[in-house]
Amino acid sequence: MATLAACGLIDLGKLAQDGVRVRASAGATSYRRRATLEEHLAQARDVVEQLKREVDDDPAASNQRIGAARQRAARERVERVDAALAKLREVEAQRERRLKTNRKQAEKQKEPRVSTTDPEVRILKMADGGFRPAWNGQVISAAGTSIVAGVTPCAEGSDRGLIRPILDKLRTRFGRLPERHLADGGFTAANDIEWAHGEGIEVYCPPTQSKHGGDPCQPRAGDGPGVLAWRSRMASQEGKRQYRSRAICECIHARWRNWNLIRFNVRGQAKVAAVMLWHALANNILQADRMLRGHRITTA
């Protein structure tokens, strides 16, 4: 990326952000409510204790090895259910916070469930309208190119509110923030736009249409200085011109789909992030080679 930036082929001051949903390595039937998880945890602990007694009582070495393997599998089951219960507590805490801000919507939701296969993954709405265990992979790219600057798998079902946390991670990595940041309408969040304005970042994402059918670019009561500047920016021809370069980031997702990134074969956010990073590296190697060869031809 440093070489491409030095050649003027990419501009790290202008980034695009988009999300791609990829099926997780967890079954829809692996999701359990609190009562079921606690029951499974008690059963798993009973199995561990029973297997310990069997291994101690059986003097045969081969049978001991088989028993030890079964015992290890039972311990791993206990660990997974324990992790699921810990994750469930986080989900329940999030629901309690939502009750304070949007009580009607929170009350409509069913009792939270967590997967015993991969407690970190949530059920998300997919592009085909179905609901399946999946990761919301956030991809940051140099706007107007297919060069990936960063990847982060998230469990959030909505892109709203993900601009700030992703850019904070990018600042940790590169030591800087972009001057302009492009994202689709699903990322539009007043808090993120105000934060970006305070950091000197111009956000380009389409404003959401109001339920009354008014012009979404017109100022509204309660708008802060950052949101006011953003609405004015998106109403201008220059703002629309800048935003058009965001569309190219969709090509990255299409390329990864062609590489069969349909479903992750690993579990846990850290391992999923590693798979996404390998795809990003492969993507950047191919795209950088193409861009540098074109640059040499034009400068020859």
What are these regions (language model features)?
Residues M1-A300:
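Anion-binding and metal-coordination hotspots
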